[in-house]
């Protein structure tokens, strides 16, 4: 690692970090150096430096990092949408905005979103959506942490859905449970949205099941412990590997630092 990068993010080799963390710090350092040479905005550079310092110190993201994640999420979504034109990843900064998008029944469509779960709160979740011409949408929500932590917000979301979308919209909620810190939700949401895109045939089948008989399980499967999170495309530790997103893209490098 070059001296300039060490000054920005610290020297991970001097600490007892795992090879995986060392690799992430090195790759993020490369992305920062590339972004600096490209003249990227100072606010985005500061975001990258803050994330890199947390990684190098081997500490969990905090509320400051979460605020930076939220602030830069539209840029991050745009970056991924350029790379994957059919992804259609959106930032829904309020439940109301999410419902507005779900009310569009003009055409068939598939898109993903990282959604603020409740007004006035910072917690975000991932959603994979199918809209249908003249019919209600189906929505698969992926919670990175624990449902019970946010149970009041989920009850409100469902109640608001009935009022704004009617009773025909079909929802499925998957508790992935991979998030262990209090401030990783945005980046886990991004990764789950990307995993849903990568596993498109599986999610298409789940949406069809949800549309036709109200559950993502196959018809006739009444198992109470049916947990699609076991599918490798959802809960794999590395939904998108570093090799698939070059470290020269600072935004995409940042999206991988917390959940891989």
Curated annotation (Swiss-Prot):
InterPro entries (alphabetical): YopJ-like (IPR005083)
Which principal EC class is assigned to this enzyme?
transferase
Q: Does the keyword Cytoplasm apply?
A: no
- A Pfam family for this UniProt protein? Acetyltransf_14
- What are the catalytic residues? 123, 143, 185
Keyword list, A-Z: Acyltransferase, Plasmid, Transferase
Q: Name one GO molecular function term.
A: acyltransferase activity
Residues that coordinate or bind CoA: 123, 180-181
Give its E.C. classification number: 2.3.1.-
| The keyword Zinc is assigned to this record | no
Q: What reactions does this protein catalyze? A: L-threonyl-[protein] + acetyl-CoA = O-acetyl-L-threonyl-[protein] + CoA; L-seryl-[protein] + acetyl-CoA = O-acetyl-L-seryl-[protein] + CoA
Write out the function statement from the record: Serine/threonine-protein acetyltransferase translocated into infected cells, which mediates acetylation of serine and threonine residues of host target proteins.
Give the similarity note. Answer: Belongs to the acetyltransferase YopJ family.
Name this polypeptide is given: Serine/threonine-protein acetyltransferase NGR_a02610
**Taxonomic placement:** Bacteria, Pseudomonadati, Pseudomonadota, Alphaproteobacteria, Hyphomicrobiales
